[in-house]
Structure formats: structure tokens, C-alpha cells
UniProtKB/Swiss-Prot annotation:
GO molecular function, one term: magnesium ion binding
Residue sites binding Mg(2+) per the record: 152, 181
GO BP annotation list: 1-deoxy-D-xylulose 5-phosphate biosynthetic process; isopentenyl diphosphate biosynthetic process, methylerythritol 4-phosphate pathway; terpenoid biosynthetic process; thiamine biosynthetic process
UniProt cross-references to PROSITE patterns, sorted A to Z: TRANSKETOLASE_1, TRANSKETOLASE_2
Disulfide pairings: none
The name this protein goes by in its record: 1-deoxy-D-xylulose-5-phosphate synthase
EC number: 2.2.1.7
Lineage summary: Bacteria, Pseudomonadati, Pseudomonadota, Gammaproteobacteria, Enterobacterales
One Pfam family cited in the UniProt record for this chain: DXP_synthase_N
Stored Gene3D superfamilies: 3.40.50.920, 3.40.50.970
Subunit-level organization: Homodimer.
UniProt pathway: Metabolic intermediate biosynthesis; 1-deoxy-D-xylulose 5-phosphate biosynthesis; 1-deoxy-D-xylulose 5-phosphate from D-glyceraldehyde 3-phosphate and pyruvate: step 1/1
Ranges annotated as spanning the membrane: none
Protein species of origin: Salmonella arizonae (strain ATCC BAA-731 / CDC346-86 / RSK2980)
Cofactor note: Binds 1 Mg(2+) ion per subunit. Binds 1 thiamine pyrophosphate per subunit.
């Protein structure tokens, strides 16, 4: 879409932060209003992350107005909230391409702009990186400032607290801003507290505070009395004792939608020494009433009509794999009181809404804490329960040591329901589920299953849940199922595949939901088609049988080729000295950028035409 200067006259004056800082201060509220309307207009036409950005408009304007970006370095945690940042930093006219193939990256991305200091997508990394950047800036000696913006969800992760603990120890000059959009302490947001924030962030208070510490540092009783007095005074109106104990100078909470007040506070804080913590209160979805009322639904949106106030229903009548999992979970929980379900802040995405309502005492959302989620599951298993950890493939990476140390070594019966396996699409490199087969396959005693359709997914969930000799994993993709009939649940024989079609010369060994494409290729090439089902343990007998009866084999998976299921097939053949040629087809050795799932598969040769072309070229 073309930028409408008449509709956004103030925003039209700002195509860079240098131009922003030339605006008179009194025009900034109007700029914020136009920026919010432009964000609504753009994202509703193109799709993308929505509610978070609406809540950070004033903060973004204030930060770029006060700080000399890009010289001063601004780091956004996760990046869902950074659309206004992209608009103000030279990407205004391209915002309609965000999350699309060849368009703007969905998150801050170093290769896209000098304003994007840290490439992000996963949560809770900003403070750790910010400390390193602040230390480097201090050694550089050019008075470069460092600011990290982190949300109230991301700050719950252990990594954020590890970083703050370190910052309190080495005391770099940096500012951490907590964007709190839960409004959990909204009663503190008002004229008194805004005045207090400006007072506490001022140089007079700061100098008195630090000077008093130095004067009385040698008199422990007086030092302790002063500390307690200060905490008592601040504690009456400030909920920041935790951050103070970690070594930060805490300011807030303040109104995150008062751009003028934010500018005053940020100007005061810019020159303070040591780690600073500013707590701002915002409303997710601010300025668009439907998003304010339902920020979860409007977190990420498809194209929609803003005037309707609602999002279009998903196309197609087929359920998604997440719903298949959620239905199985509820069905099983109704029969087995030992089932416990765990998610690290992915209730909606993992299909667990209905379960959380029907079985609230057996549903555990541990927040953005993947490591804790996995070891918590270990504890439940030790206690005699049957934990199911529902987690995205890309986020399970964050708990790899816990999978090995706390579950696999102890052979605990924990089942991982791995959603978003394979190509995810619009969220790009940070969210593709490209590696789970590779990093799980090498773990002893792990059983790994790859369903080819929704019925097989249900059977595998049932099989994994009733397996008691160690951990299991069932991985399934983002998107709709295939429409096959659902049969009664029964346990599958562990480590056994099935032949779906008999052919000649070539056998295709398929792992997962690329089966429809594999079936088309097998038909076109008159090849044998095998649904391998299990990545671990592999059906070695079936693999050797296929090698003996065919001139060549091709493996197919939506996982990295390196270390994936195909690599396992190669290992079996080499161990048995079978010199049959094998073509491994899967995800290549690079990080896959954003685009639709269909676009990515076509470009990577993982649609039927691409798979057939790869095999023909290899056989030629």
C-alpha cells in the first residue's frame, strides 16, 4: 500500500529518528495518534503481530526522541512490539510487507537495519545481550547508551533474572524498561506516582542517594538504617523491591501512554550511572477497542476489516493438528486422573484452551520457562503422574539439557507433544521447527514418532502416553490436518513402519506429514512408499528389506537433513555394510526465512513437484 500523506501529515515528516528529533515536543501526541492509526491500517491489510505494537507507540516515540539512535543502542525483547520502531526507523513505507516472503522481517533483525541492534524472536534475551553491549560501549569510551525493552511475560523467564543478577554485580550503565501491559498494579499509575518517578529519576535524588551511601559506607548501623528508611519510603508507593535487591535503581510504575511524561523521565534517567530499571504500565491493543478487550486473539492477526471489530474465521473445515492434540488430551484426561498437562505460555497456540477449562487442577502454564517446564514434568513423573509437555519445536531447544539430564537419564515417562515441527512460515528463522529430530535422535532411550496424518497422530499420542520405559516425543506441524477418518485409539508397535505402496527400483521412506506429497511422487515414479512412523527406534528390519529389494532409497522429512531421520537410515545401512545409494531430502543447511509454508516448501523443493525433480535429477 502507498503511504497517504494527507491521512498522516505528522508521520509523513518522520522517516528517520533524526527527523523525529526535529519535531517540536508538543506535536508528539499527534504523531503517536497517527502512528497507531497507521499501524492498524497497515497490519489489517497485510497480517502480522498487532496488539503488542499498539501498546508501545508512546514508548517507542519517547525512546527515539530522547536517545540518539542508532548511535545509542536500543534492544527489543522478543520483538512482537517493535512494529512502531520499524516504522520510525526508515521502514515506514515497507511495513505492509512484514512477515511476507522477501519483505520486512517479523522481528528486529540485524541484517535489515542498523537500528536493530539484536536479532530476536525468542524471549528474554535482551538483558543478557544488553549487558554485553553496555560493557563493550564502556570500553569503547564514546558515551554510547544502552536500553533494553522487555515485556512482563518475557521477564518471568529465568534468563532475564540471571542477567539482572549479573548486572547488579558488575553495574554497567544501562537502562532496562519493563513494559507491563497486564495492569496488575494499575492503582499505582496516577499523578502522584508519575511525579515520584520524575523525582526519583532526577539527578538531585540520584546524587543524594549515591553520596549518602559513600559517606556512611564505613558506618554499618547507619548505612543499614538509611537503606531501610529508603526502602520504607519507596515501598509505600513503589513495587520495585525485587529489582532494587538485584542491584537496579527502580523507577515507576509510570503511565506508558503519556509520551510527554515518558520523555521527561527518560531524559532524567539517560545520564544516571549503573543499572537503571524503569517500570511502565501500558495496555496491549491500545487505541483499538476489540484488541484492548481481547489482546490474546489480536496478538497476531490475519488480514481483517478493522471496522468489523473481529477477525475472519480460519479457512477450511479441517481441524488443525493443535486441535487434534487438544481433543486427544481432553479425551485421555477424562479417563485417566494421572494425566497432567504443561505448557510454557502457549495455551492457545498448543490447543490447550478447552483442557485448561475442563481440568484446571491438572493444567499448568509455567510461563515463559521452558527449562522449568521440563524439569517440573520430571518431578511429576517421579511422583507417579503422567505429564504431557506441549511445546513448540523451536522452544524445546531452550530446555535441551533438562530433557537429557532430568528426564532421559532417569528414563522418566514424560511425553513431549511437539507442535510447529518443520516449516512454520511467516515468523521466519527463529521459529522454524527445523532441528528437533536432529537434537532428540541422539538421546539414549528417547522414542520419537512422526505421524503422517491426524489419525496416526492420535495413535502416536496414545502410544507415547502409555509408554513407561522412558521419554517419548510426537512431532506434528503447524496447519490443518488432512481429513482422514479417526479410528479407535490403540497402541502402535514401537519402532515399526508400514509399507503403503509397492513399486519397483526406488523406495521412498517417509517420516511425517509430507506423506501426501510422497504418495504423489511414488505414484509418478512407480516407487515403493513406506510410512516409517518412528525416527527412534528405527525399523531396521524394514530398512534392510527395502535396501535388498530396491536399487536406491530416498528419505523424506521436514527436518534438517544433517542429523535427521535420513541420517539415521544412512547409519543403519553403513552398519550393515549395505552399499545402496540413498538420497536424503529435507531442510537444507541454512536458516529458512519467512514466507508462507507453501512458498517455503516450493522454494526448497519439498512439494510434490520439487521432490520428484530432486529424485529424477539424482537418478539421472
Amino acid at each position: 500500500m502507498s503511504f497517504d500523506i494527507a491521512k498522516y501529515p505528522t508521520l509523513a515528516l518522520v522517516d528517520s529518528t533524526q527527523e523525529l528529533r526535529l519535531l517540536p515536543k508538543e506535536s508528539l501526541p499527534k504523531l503517536c495518534d497517527e502512528l497507531r492509526r497507521y499501524l492498524l491500517d497497515s497490519v489489517s491489510r497485510s497480517s502480522g503481530h498487532f496488539a503488542s505494537g499498539l501498546g508501545t507507540v508512546e514508548l517507542t516515540v519517547a525512546l527515539h526522541y530522547v536517545y540518539n539512535t542508532p548511535f545509542d543502542q536500543l534492544i527489543w525483547d522478543v520483538g512482537h512490539q517493535a512494529y512502531p520502531h520499524k516504522i520510525l526507523t526508515g521502514r515506514r513505507d515497507k511495513i505492509g510487507t512484514i512477515r511476507q516472503k522477501g519483505g520486512l522481517h517479523p522481528f528486529p533483525w540485524r541484517g535489515e537495519s542498523e537500528y536493530d541492534v539484536l536479532s530476536v524472536g525468542h524471549s528474554s534475551t535482551s538483558i543478557s545481550a544488553g549487558i554485553g553491549i553496555a560493557v563493550a560501549a564502556e570500553k569503547e569510551g564514546k558515551d554510547r547508551r544502552t536500553v533494553c525493552v522487555i515485556g512482563d511475560g518475557a521477564i518471568t523467564a529465568g534468563m532475564a533474572f540471571e542477567a539482572m543478577n549479573h548486572a547488579g554485580d558488575i553495574r554497567p550503565d544501562m537502562l532496562v524498561i519493563l513494559n507491563d501491559n497486564e495492569m496488575s498494579i494499575s492503582e499505582n499509575v496516577g499523578a502522584l506516582n508519575n511525579h515520584l518517578a520524575q523525582l526519583l529519576s532526577g539527578k538531585l535524588y540520584s546524587s543524594l542517594r549515591e553520596g549518602g551511601k559513600k559517606v556512611f559506607s564505613g558506618v554499618p548501623p547507619i548505612k543499614e538504617l538509611l537503606k531501610r528508611t529508603e526502602e520504607h519510603i519507596k515501598g509505600m508507593v513503589v513495587p520495585g523491591t525485587l529489582f532494587e535487591e538485584l542491584g537496579f535503581n527502580y523507577i515507576g510504575p509510570v503511565d506508558g501512554h503519556d509520551v510527554m511524561g515518558l520523555i521527561s523521565t527518560l531524559k532524567n534517567m539517560r545520564d544516571l550511572k549503573g543499572p537503571q530499571f524503569l517500570h511502565i504500565m501500558t495496555k496491549k491493543g491500545r487505541g483499538y477497542e476489540p484488541a484492548e478487550k481481547d489482546p490474546i486473539t489480536f496478538h497476531a492477526v490475519p488480514k481483517f476489516d478493522p471496522s468489523s471489530g473481529c477477525l475472519p474465521k480460519s479457512s477450511g473445515s479441517l481441524p488443525g493438528y493443535s486441535k487434534i492434540f487438544g481433543d486427544w488430551l481432553c479425551e485421555t484426561a477424562a479417563k485417566d486422573s494421572k494425566l497432567m498437562a504443561i505448557t510454557p505460555a502457549m495455551r492457545e497456540g498448543s490447543g490447550m484452551v478447552e483442557f485448561s477449562r475442563k481440568f484446571p487442577d491438572r493444567y499448568f502454564d509455567v510461563a515463559i520457562a521452558e527449562q522449568h517446564a521440563v524439569t517440573f514434568a520430571a518431578g511429576l513423573a517421579i511422583g507417579g503422574y503422567k505429564p504431557v509437555v506441549a511445546i513448540y519445536s523451536t522452544f524445546l531447544q531452550r530446555a535441551y539439557d533438562q530433557v537429557i539430564h532430568d528426564i532421559a537419564i532417569q528414563k522418566l515417562p514424560v511425553m513431549f507433544a511437539i507442535d510447529r515441527a518443520g516449516i512454520v512460515g511467516a515468523d521466519g528463522q527463529t521459529h522454524q521447527g527445523a532441528f528437533d529430530l536432529s537434537y532428540l535422535r541422539c538421546i539414549p532411550d528417547m522414542v520419537i514418532m512422526t505421524p503422517s496424518d491426524e489419525n496416526e497422530c492420535r495413535q502416536m499420542l496414545f502410544t507415547g502416553y502409555h509408554y513407561n520405559d522412558g521419554p517419548t516425543a510426537v512431532r506434528y506441524p503447524r496447519g490443518n490436518a488432512q481429513g482422514v477418518a479417526l479410528t479407535p485409539l490403540e497402541k502402535l508397535p514401537i519402532g515399526k513402519g508400514i509399507v503403503k505402496r509397492h513399486g519397483e527400483k526406488l523406495a521412498i521412506l517417509n517420516f511425517g506429514t509430507l506423506m501426501p506429497e510422497a504418495a504423489k511422487v511414488a505414484e509418478a515414479l512407480n516407487a515403493t512408499l513406506v510410512d516409517m512412523r518412528f525416527v527412534k527406534p528405527l525399523d531396521e528390519t524394514l530398512i534392510l528389506e527395502m535396501a535388498a529389494r530396491h536399487e536406491a532409497l530416498a528419505t523424506l522429512e521436514e527436518n534438517a537433513i544433517m542429523g535427521g531421520a535420513g541420517s539415521g537410515v544412512n547409519e543403519v545401512l553403513m552398519a550393515h555394510r549395505k552399499p545402496v545409494p540413498v538420497l536424503n531430502i529435507g531442510l537444507p543447511d541454512f536458516f529458512i526465512p519467512q514466507g508462507t509454508q507453501e512458498e517455503a516448501r516450493a522454494e526448497l523443493g519439498l512439494d510434490a513437484a520439487g521432490i520428484e525433480a530432486k529424485i529424477k535429477a539424482w537418478l539421472a
